[in-house]
Amino acid sequence: MEEKIFAKLGRAAVLEQLAEEASEVAQAALKMARIIRGENPTPKTHMEARADLEEELADFRVCVEVLDRNDLIFEMEIIKKLSEVKMKRWLDRLENMRG
Protein backbone atom coordinates (compact mmCIF):
# COMPACT_ATOMS: atom_id res chain seq x y z
CA MET A 1 0.00 0.00 0.00
CA GLU A 2 2.76 2.42 0.96
CA GLU A 3 4.39 2.02 -2.43
CA LYS A 4 1.16 2.82 -4.29
CA ILE A 5 0.53 5.91 -2.19
CA PHE A 6 4.08 7.16 -2.74
CA ALA A 7 3.90 6.44 -6.49
CA LYS A 8 0.65 8.38 -6.85
CA LEU A 9 1.63 11.36 -4.70
CA GLY A 10 5.40 11.65 -4.78
CA ARG A 11 7.87 12.82 -2.16
CA ALA A 12 6.83 16.48 -1.94
CA ALA A 13 3.13 15.75 -1.46
CA VAL A 14 3.81 13.13 1.21
CA LEU A 15 6.07 15.60 3.04
CA GLU A 16 3.32 18.23 2.82
CA GLN A 17 0.85 15.72 4.24
CA LEU A 18 3.32 14.89 7.02
CA ALA A 19 3.57 18.58 7.94
CA GLU A 20 -0.22 18.94 7.94
CA GLU A 21 -0.62 15.89 10.16
CA ALA A 22 2.09 17.16 12.53
CA SER A 23 0.09 20.35 12.94
CA GLU A 24 -3.07 18.37 13.63
CA VAL A 25 -1.25 16.23 16.22
CA ALA A 26 -0.14 19.44 17.93
CA GLN A 27 -3.70 20.80 18.01
CA ALA A 28 -5.12 17.53 19.35
CA ALA A 29 -2.41 17.33 22.04
CA LEU A 30 -3.11 20.91 23.12
CA LYS A 31 -6.83 20.16 23.34
CA MET A 32 -6.10 17.11 25.49
CA ALA A 33 -3.84 19.18 27.77
CA ARG A 34 -6.65 21.71 28.25
CA ILE A 35 -9.00 18.93 29.30
CA ILE A 36 -6.46 17.37 31.67
CA ARG A 37 -5.76 20.71 33.35
CA GLY A 38 -9.40 21.72 33.47
CA GLU A 39 -8.46 25.21 32.32
CA ASN A 40 -9.85 27.02 29.31
CA PRO A 41 -12.90 24.75 28.90
CA THR A 42 -13.64 22.90 25.69
CA PRO A 43 -16.89 21.17 24.70
CA LYS A 44 -15.00 17.95 23.93
CA THR A 45 -15.00 15.14 26.45
CA HIS A 46 -11.83 13.39 27.55
CA MET A 47 -12.75 10.36 25.43
CA GLU A 48 -13.45 12.51 22.35
CA ALA A 49 -10.15 14.33 22.73
CA ARG A 50 -8.32 11.05 23.23
CA ALA A 51 -9.91 9.59 20.09
CA ASP A 52 -8.95 12.72 18.13
CA LEU A 53 -5.35 12.51 19.33
CA GLU A 54 -5.14 8.81 18.48
CA GLU A 55 -6.50 9.45 14.99
CA GLU A 56 -4.08 12.29 14.31
CA LEU A 57 -1.14 10.24 15.59
CA ALA A 58 -2.20 7.42 13.27
CA ASP A 59 -2.37 9.82 10.31
CA PHE A 60 1.11 11.11 11.15
CA ARG A 61 2.46 7.58 11.49
CA VAL A 62 1.02 6.60 8.10
CA CYS A 63 2.94 9.44 6.46
CA VAL A 64 6.16 8.40 8.21
CA GLU A 65 5.64 4.79 7.09
CA VAL A 66 5.03 5.82 3.48
CA LEU A 67 8.26 7.82 3.49
CA ASP A 68 10.20 5.12 5.34
CA ARG A 69 9.29 2.40 2.85
CA ASN A 70 9.74 4.41 -0.31
CA ASP A 71 12.20 7.20 0.14
CA LEU A 72 15.76 7.61 1.28
CA ILE A 73 15.08 11.07 2.68
CA PHE A 74 15.71 9.76 6.20
CA GLU A 75 17.02 6.64 7.92
CA MET A 76 14.74 5.11 10.55
CA GLU A 77 17.69 3.53 12.35
CA ILE A 78 19.28 6.95 12.78
CA ILE A 79 15.96 8.35 14.00
CA LYS A 80 15.67 5.50 16.53
CA LYS A 81 19.18 6.18 17.85
CA LEU A 82 18.53 9.92 18.02
CA SER A 83 15.29 9.22 19.87
CA GLU A 84 17.17 7.23 22.50
CA VAL A 85 19.66 10.09 22.98
CA LYS A 86 16.86 12.64 23.22
CA MET A 87 14.88 10.50 25.69
CA LYS A 88 17.93 10.20 27.95
CA ARG A 89 18.61 13.94 27.71
CA TRP A 90 14.98 14.74 28.57
CA LEU A 91 15.09 12.46 31.63
CA ASP A 92 18.44 13.94 32.71
CA ARG A 93 16.96 17.44 32.53
CA LEU A 94 13.94 16.39 34.58
CA GLU A 95 16.10 14.71 37.20
CA ASN A 96 18.33 17.79 37.45
CA MET A 97 15.49 20.28 37.84
CA ARG A 98 15.62 22.51 40.85
CA GLY A 99 12.59 22.94 43.01
Please report, for each region that a protein language model flagged, where it lies by residue:
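Flexible "arm" and connector segments at domain edges
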Residues: 1-57, 61-99
